[in-house]
Amino acid sequence: MSLAPSPLVGETPLHAVEVRILGCLIEKQLTTPETYPLTLNAVQLACNQKTSREPLMQLETGEVGRYLRSLEGRKLVHLVMGSRADRWEQRCDKQLELVKPQTVLLGLLMLRGPQTLNELLTRSNRMHDFDDVDEVQHQLERLIARGLAVLLPRQSGQREDRYMHLLGEPADLESLLLSRPASRGDASAPSEDRLVELEARIAALEERLARLEGAQ
């Protein structure tokens, strides 16, 4: 499948690190508003988080700072000057004219790659209260209509449709598509639900730790 980046991000698609940064800023804005906007160190920690991230990354501070400045040039993030530390906030919702449900879904797709409706519904519950999968699908269809996301054709063995963002470089998008497991049958559904629940609990603990570190 040929994947074309969204024209809404300009002539140059987003680098994989830029995609990760935006996804992290969206997530932390909604799950830990008391520590948002984020310092450079907090952005780095969020990018390198071991849960709720696909693929895992190990980014250096300088690398994160460089791509934050690149995103600032695109008006997708904004630097908030502070007396103790400078902080970063995302502006892609305003720049791309997104409502909150769309921002949440796009953020999840940036953090986790291709996902099913049920995965998105479960993983979004700490950021937005969707009524059901139909509402998730409706908002995804609006993103698709604007060229920000795509419905992927089912591969062999897959039981559910998957959706993916279109903000990244073609090679990165193809890599995301190929990196996902080819099959998740109905028999594995209970264990997948349990895994998602455990991921949410671990993420909540990590956010509590981040709040404690931010208060020091």
Swiss-Prot record:
Q: Which SUPFAM superfamilies match?
A: Winged helix' DNA-binding domain (SSF46785)
Q: Which organism is it from?
A: Ectopseudomonas mendocina (strain ymp) (Pseudomonas mendocina)
Q: Which Pfam families match?
A: DUF480
Family per similarity comment: Belongs to the UPF0502 family.
**Matching HAMAP family, A to Z?**
UPF0502
Q: Matching InterPro entries, A to Z?
A: DUF480, WH-like_DNA-bd_sf, WH_DNA-bd_sf
**Signal peptide extent:** none
For this entry, the protein name equals UPF0502 protein Pmen_2627
Q: Which Gene3D superfamilies match?
A: Winged helix-like DNA-binding domain superfamily/Winged helix DNA-binding domain
